[in-house]
From Swiss-Prot:
InterPro entries: Ribosomal_Su5_D2-typ_SF, UDP-acyl_GlcNac_deAcase, UDP-acyl_GlcNac_deAcase_C, UDP-acyl_N-AcGlcN_deAcase_N
Alphabetically ordered keywords of this record: Hydrolase, Lipid A biosynthesis, Lipid biosynthesis, Lipid metabolism, Metal-binding, Zinc
Name of the gene encoding the protein in the UniProt record: lpxC
Protein's UniProt name: UDP-3-O-acyl-N-acetylglucosamine deacetylase
GO terms for MF: metal ion binding; UDP-3-O-acyl-N-acetylglucosamine deacetylase activity
Listed GO biological process terms: lipid A biosynthetic process
Chain residues that bind Zn(2+): H79, H238, D242
Residue positions of the active site: H265
Lipid metabolism in keyword set: yes
Catalytically driven reaction(s): a UDP-3-O-[(3R)-3-hydroxyacyl]-N-acetyl-alpha-D-glucosamine + H2O = a UDP-3-O-[(3R)-3-hydroxyacyl]-alpha-D-glucosamine + acetate
PANTHER family named in the record: UDP-3-O-ACYL-N-ACETYLGLUCOSAMINE DEACETYLASE 1, MITOCHONDRIAL-RELATED
Record keyword Cell membrane present: no
């Protein structure tokens, strides 16, 4: 039987909030089977929980937020959510003493390291996957995203940025997903932004944690970071990282083929909601026979060590 996963122990880290620029303490806690992914703000009294749920997602100019019925929100969840998807973590309590998850280096890699440091535990309960049964597509002008049936999890993402630093040959990336492929090829790709936008936002008291330490920063001509890029196609890899996190907002790994053109958080979420709203387009599946599990979700020994 393919089992649900949680953490072996509690781990903690500190970072800076992208919005406030203030120190944030992040605590990751194991959770029992069928808990799901829960984000918790401990800076509020009493603490407020935000279960990962496609319908709770709000896209802002700077990040993805989860918002509850009282309009209380927790921000910048997308990169940690991608790390949870990448390692197939089904049950976890994510606590922060702030309104946002720390931005860390702008990628998912610090969260992957933290999760691996905690250790991954298998629970004696079947893991539920969402399997795509019919093609579902959403569009917004010339942007689009779709899911098709596929016995695995594949991603094909194209961006279209007219910028000298983003070469035409590096605007498309495809991935046959696995935990190992995610860690090696996707998790280290950082978010990116224009220097002029960061300066403008900071002049208005926003994006106070934005810096070269947590993003690729470009001007009109080049990448400004001294160390340059981690991958020549880091921009599109990061957009794929975002999509992996966005699509895991249903709390389950998805079995299907995802293709997107110029998509972002809002359109990724629109696709996920469109799939879930169409009952005949998907189903929950479990795997009693390990041999029937798609290769995409077979954990390498380093993950479950």
């Amino acid at each position: 039987m393919i089992k649900q996963r949680t953490l072996k122990r509690i781990v903690q880290a500190t970072g800076v909030g992208l919005h406030t620029g203030k120190k944030v303490t992040l605590t990751l806690r194991p959770a029992p089977a069928n808990t799901g992914v829960i984000y918790r703000r401990t800076d509020l009294n009493p603490p407020v929980d935000f279960p990962a749920d496609a319908k709770s997602v709000r896209d802002t100019m700077l990040c993805t937020c989860l918002v509850n019925e009282h309009d209380v929100r927790i921000s910048t969840v997308e990169h940690l959510n991608a790390a949870l998807a990448g390692l197939g973590i089904d049950n976890i309590i994510v606590e922060v003493d702030a309104p946002e998850i720390p931005i860390m280096d702008g990628s998912a890699a610090p969260f992957v390291y933290l999760l691996l440091d905690a250790g991954i535990d298998e629970l004696n309960c079947a893991k539920k996957f969402v399997r795509i049964k019919e093609t579902v597509r959403v569009e917004d002008g010339d942007k689009w995203a779709e899911f098709k049936p596929y016995n695995g999890f594949s991603l094909d993402f194209t961006i279209d940025f007219n910028h000298p630093a983003i070469d035409a040959s590096t605007q498309r990336y495809t991935l046959n997903f696995s935990a190992d492929a995610f860690m090696r090829q996707i998790s280290r790709a950082r978010t990116f932004g224009f220097m002029r936008d960061i300066e403008y936002l900071q002049s208005r008291g926003l994006c106070l944690g934005g810096s070269f330490d947590c993003a690729i920063v470009v001007d009109d001509y080049r990448v400004l970071n001294e160390d340059g890029l981690r991958f020549e196609d880091e921009f599109v890899r990061h957009k794929m990282l975002d999509a992996i996190g966005d699509l895991f907002m249903c709390g389950h790994n998805i079995i299907g083929a995802f293709t997107a053109y110029k998509s972002g958080h809002a359109l990724n979420n629109k696709l996920l909601q469109a799939v879930l709203a169409k009952q005949e387009a998907w189903e929950y599946v479990t795997f009693e026979d390990d041999a029937k599990l798609p290769m995409a979700f077979r954990a390498p020994s380093m993950v479950l060590a």
